[in-house]
Amino acid sequence: MAYALLAAMVLNGCATSKEKAARKTEQAAKVKAVLAEKHYKIVVNSMADLSETDEKRSPQLLSTYRLEVRNDSLITFLPHYGYNHILGEAGVGTRGLILYEPISSYQEELTKKSKRHIEISVEKEDDTLIFMIEVSANGNSNISVRSLRRDRISYFGNIMLD
């Protein structure tokens, strides 16, 4: 009786492991597909201020911030802490990274760790912004933004699959 119970538990565990592996494979295929279509949205839930200050900030974000690629356009609604070098402003306010701009360049490659590395460049008024995005097979995403006018900043979130 004990052997039958143990065998049932082991077989159930194997089925669960197979189901998890199948779900991971399916999710990786979905991530790959949305990236290939160049039509995806990344919902951002935290950020890291990478400015040259001694004080590093990494707040959780309470609102729905996002980065979206729609074919040849980049749409962002992201907060920005740090310094605006052209305007001489510090802090966060109405000057977040709010964009709806055509993409100047879009490059994607697969890294050695099986992550997708995407580099998107957009030009806005007198600034050029470069978005470097790392997307893992499970949809976790890291976004690093470089700008001529603002301090560098990073965001962390997940790609939306539905």
Model regions: which residues?
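C-terminal motif of bacterial Sec signal peptides marking the signal peptidase cleavage site
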Residues: 11-13
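A short, Trp-centered hydrophobic/proline-enriched beta-strand micro-motif
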Residues: 33-49
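Extracytoplasmic beta-rich ectodomain segments of secreted or membrane-anchored proteins
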Residues: 45-70, 77
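Helix-rich interaction surfaces within compact, conserved domain-sized segments
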Residues: 99-162
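Bacterial N-terminal signal peptides that target proteins for export
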Residues: 1-2
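Mid-length scaffold segments of soluble, non-membrane domains
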Residues: 63-111
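Structural motif
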Residues: 39, 71-75, 140
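Bacterial signal peptide processing site
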Residues: 15-18
